Amino acid sequence: MLRLITQLSEAQTEIKRIAARTHSEQVQHQEATVREILQNVRRQGDEALLRYTLEFDQVRLAPGDLVVGAAELDAAYQRVSTSLLKAIRLAKQRIEQFHRERICKSWVQFQDRGIVLGRRYTPVDAAGLYIPGGRASYPSSVLMSAIPAVVAGVPRIVLVTPPNPEGKINPAVLVAAQESGVHEIYRIGGAQAIGALTYGTRTIAPVSVIAGPGNIYVTLAKKLVYGEVGIDSLAGPSEVLIIADSTANPVFLAADMLAQAEHDSLASAILITPDGRLAERTIEAVDRQLENHPRRTLTEKSLANYGLVIVTADLAEAAALSNLFAPEHLELEVEDPWELLEKVRHAGAIFLGHATPEAVGDYLAGPSHILPTSGTARYASGVGVETFQKCSSLVQYTPQALAEVGEAIDALTAAEGLPSHGDSVRLRLQQYENPHSPTQQQQEE
């Protein structure tokens, strides 16, 4: 089931294949469907949302059912266990503590001649958070997306998630949303939810930024609306890449690989090690742990299609293969992970050492688990406070400072053929030099 590869060229080919697993002709067909859904939501608003909820979720809603009301929110607390509520609050505390250290702070710099330069950070007006739902429940994704928005100071935070077959939202999701500070919750999902957040409907006001993971339809919808709203990233199937040496425990490695593969049939789990015996023992451990796995069929399919065990010449070669893949999650299960870290350039989140399984980061370590996938860690980052903030440059000049750069600006504007740019400086300097002389406009009047 798990393929063992010992040739570098074959390993490179397979890693590229797995990284491109979402790029298919089927995606092109799905994009056409998503485009139609978005257009209908833009034109028909709530009517389209209700129709698509019935079609895709098999749930019939009335217009007033889209919003999750106070009674359902209050009742959610009665339907979660004390242990789960305690875990949600612990996760919230740790996630919030981490993100408070990441707030982008405004600054100004005072230079000679009275020049002031700086940057001013402000939150977006409204953030939309997409949380997968239906039969599944992901309260951790609520915490990981909502808390950075709250810390950023976003005044309106909206959460959308598809209902279950009874038309309800999982109580754990509702509790996590309330604990995190979400302001509005709507029971809609899929591409239609992204359309509602982008264009607005009678019930749902539009937002400025959309964040959160979803299926291929949600991802394509985010891709198509980007530019009208901001987005965090285009999420693909989940993935983990583990670099291990002889100090690693194959039982732990197998568990970490299965933890990724059990997500869905497109998930990827890759182990790279210079220790051939460790590679073989890990494959054996995977087989043993799969015997009574409750999601065995799905997990086996994932491992068969997108699971690899690669034996390399050394750890440097392993790091090079990891950089080629640019994984969402990277585990460094080696004797000195901080030394190996120096060779790592591309990864969404990096877990260092034998006692740091990815699951710690998935739930409560602090950094968001909403991370770049499908090789996008080469240029993208995970969700954070900065996802919900934007920056304005600050510039102030005095007449004296403007005079010192006037000649340079005049030369540059002349080179670009933009005379009014030059005039905007020249006219000011003329007035500053002769404050009592009339400007050209005054002369013409």
UniProtKB/Swiss-Prot annotation:
Keywords in alphabetical order: Amino-acid biosynthesis, Histidine biosynthesis, Metal-binding, NAD, Oxidoreductase, Zinc
UniProt-annotated binding residues for Zn(2+): 260, 263, 362, 421
A Gene Ontology molecular function term of the record: NAD binding
GO CC term (a single one): cytosol
Pathway: Amino-acid biosynthesis; L-histidine biosynthesis; L-histidine from 5-phospho-alpha-D-ribose 1-diphosphate: step 9/9
Requisite cofactors: Zn(2+)
GO BP term (any one): L-histidine biosynthetic process
Residues engaged in binding substrate: 238, 260, 263, 329, 362, 416, 421
Cofactor binding notes: Binds 1 zinc ion per subunit.
Gene3D superfamilies: 1.20.5.1300, Nitrogenase molybdenum iron protein domain (3.40.50.1980)
Domain of life: Bacteria
Role summary: Catalyzes the sequential NAD-dependent oxidations of L-histidinol to L-histidinaldehyde and then to L-histidine.
PANTHER family per record: HISTIDINE BIOSYNTHESIS TRIFUNCTIONAL PROTEIN, HISTIDINOL DEHYDROGENASE HDH
Name of the protein this chain belongs to: Histidinol dehydrogenase
Organism of derivation: Gloeobacter violaceus (strain ATCC 29082 / PCC 7421)
Gene encoding the protein: hisD
